């Protein structure tokens, strides 16, 4: 037998769920790296967890290390000896090489060639050794390499960890791993484990991976998180069928309850129907954030959308057979939570949205109050409303009035008691308060949707009306924070400006709105007129970089369009997609290769050209047939009315043939300066015209 199963359990105090889930994804990679570092070829690696333990299971862990050769290269032999024929032995430099390696026999030296030079050389053979002596060092290095964000020290231990470690149990090939002192964490190892707390608090000895799994299974510990998840989902499904309900499975919440349980059980509780007068979001958020409960909905026909049910799913870690006692305890806690929510909500309804003291809340230090921000957004919203009036399906005067009202009350809920308790309900509560105070429904909905999209694939504002309110918020935040120098760098983006910028582009693209990242940014900056001065090109560039996240496409195609003067968001996207369609079409393969080659020559000729230089040319100075042929083909494109971008790109790529012939037969740098200048001016016009679709030299396919 050359290998055996290795199991390592790290027994800890309860691990915080979110920190555990974040780092769990990285654990297999980190363990693989430690094995590779020691040239250990192991079989399949599995890592399991419960809130109280991490378990590393490695199939076919080798009993012996591999025999390895370690090579050392010294100084060139020309400078390592006292004389050239080496008869007088090694000099200080040569001796130093061997002494550094702890070798005393210098008489039988070896040489090797490195970088075409003969140098002193020594090879050290590492014989096979038992791997059992490597296991604890690997485990300790693994623990030290885990990053949970925060760590703590306990007692007089040398190392820190996210929670105190109580034991490391190693089971491998019948070897004895008992009593190994782990000074770093302040304990001696035991080949033992602990089970579910309701089954006992003492260590239970185990002598093999098989025995370990049997002990846990017998004592209500489901080690595999996938099996715990499956148990929860199966029990929820049974409750849905039995009670004719639908349970909303929140993925993040499911992951969390899996991480905080060792033997989960899904139980159905209920709350007083009187609480259903609260907005659904208050109830579901309170259940999720405070109690880790899943929301329950009434089962309806396919034509009807489900309504919130006065029930909830709690996932218990108890193995108590008296389930009703557990349910009753959770119902009591939820009743108190929802009673608080009713109190907060009813208090908020008493406060008119107009009277919210926004001036008392600082937006960002140095950037004024929420009232200042609201006033800046109002100016931006007015500009956008006038610009997009044809898409609003209402008279301009009415649109200005309603959107102005929406912006004025949009931040009022930030000072509400409910949002103070549940910050994720900002905007949502503003919507409910606006409806209760008889605001226009479009106004109320735009307050709710002002923060959309919340993530890359999240919903967008449902109308151009709401889009204007959302864009106003995003544009003001970008102007304000960039003007204050709070620009994202590296992985740091404390104000989520990358997400905010992505949302801006996505909204504009979705509704096909005209927005120029040079002209409109400049106009808005000047119109608001209160931002600290900064280089708008920095913001423009920042927004342009987000196109790489917005469009699923070869980055070089996106780059080719961004390298032109086009700054209209929708047109950039249209050009990128049209180029992609053309380049992805197999029938265009030869055409695109020929054009790439010709365009690069065209770009090289014009690379040092001053854009402000006159580009006038005269056909009368054309001497070669190929000049006339290229001009006629180019002029035909210039005078054509294309149905769309696809046909325009097709036409431009059709210039590959006359361009190739031109460069084969025409000497651009003619001795006659007038002819030379005429040819360069003509080619500059062709080059500039190409830039209407993209900077083709940037494309790499």
UniProtKB/Swiss-Prot annotation:
Its main location: cytoplasm. GO terms for biological process: glycyl-tRNA aminoacylation. One of its GO terms (cellular component) is cytosol. It catalyses: tRNA(Gly) + glycine + ATP = glycyl-tRNA(Gly) + AMP + diphosphate. One of its GO terms (molecular function) is glycine-tRNA ligase activity. It is found in: Cytoplasm. Keywords: Aminoacyl-tRNA synthetase, ATP-binding, Cytoplasm, Ligase, Nucleotide-binding, Protein biosynthesis. Its EC number is 6.1.1.14. Tetramer of two alpha and two beta subunits. PANTHER family: GLYCINE--TRNA LIGASE, CHLOROPLASTIC_MITOCHONDRIAL 2 (PTHR30075:SF2), GLYCYL-TRNA SYNTHETASE (PTHR30075). HAMAP family: Gly_tRNA_synth_beta. NCBIfam families: glyS. Belongs to the class-II aminoacyl-tRNA synthetase family. This is Glycine--tRNA ligase beta subunit. It comes from Helicobacter pylori (strain HPAG1). The lineage of its organism: Bacteria, Pseudomonadati, Campylobacterota, Epsilonproteobacteria, Campylobacterales.
